Amino acid sequence: VKKAENSKERFVKRFGDDSDVDYPLAVVKNPYIGDTLGVSNIVIDGGVSDDADAGEREAFDRDKGIIVGNIRMGFGHYRISMAIASAANHLGYKPYWMDLNSYSETTGGKVIEAQNKLYSLGSRISGKSKAFNKVVWEPMNYEGFRKLSYNASDQMNAELMTPVFGNVPKDIPLVATHVWPAQA
């Protein structure tokens, strides 16, 4: 638990603490998969991730809405999110895309961006070095992520993602492709 608390504290020191910030949210059509999959983005209203070209604001559909939480970190998470949104749309639900990585002004968004850069670096090195794969990359990905200490840190770090959820309607279900949006 102490290791998990220290992990969270390091991120707060590095990226700040926005736990008291009230982020106003807006719903806009997703400019890429909005027409095809019926997806709308949940954005911070007037924030960096607010896509001005997406058109007018929409209201949340409280009867048929479903939020797909993701971190857009690694192609696997992104593909799974797309599949969930596609299935939800096919079944008559209204998918809302909640990409925590797009909220770059938030502490959580900054944490995700830093972790994504680190993961991308490791991934590139693993593609070039068999020794790195054997000694670092494979053990970390196959064994490290299963450790309770790692999962405790993930749980604690998920708290850094919670401020942006403050104005999300609590009566709309959320599915997520990563522990951070799921636990936040």
Annotate each language-model stretch with its function.
Residues 77, 155, 174-183:
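An aromatic- and histidine-rich active-site surface loop
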Residues 62, 169-170:
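Residue-level preference for short coil/turn positions at secondary-structure junctions
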Residues 52-54:
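Extended non-catalytic scaffold regions that mediate assembly and binding
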Residues 66-70, 174-175:
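Short hydrophobic beta-strand segments
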Residues 71-82:
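A short, glycine/small-residue-rich beta-strand->loop->alpha-helix junction that serves as a flexible
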Residues 56-66:
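A short, charged/proline- and glycine-enriched loop
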Residues 74, 103, 182:
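Surface-exposed, flexible loop/turn segments at secondary-structure boundaries
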Residues 1-48, 86-169:
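Conserved N-terminal ligand/cofactor-binding loop architecture of enzyme catalytic domains
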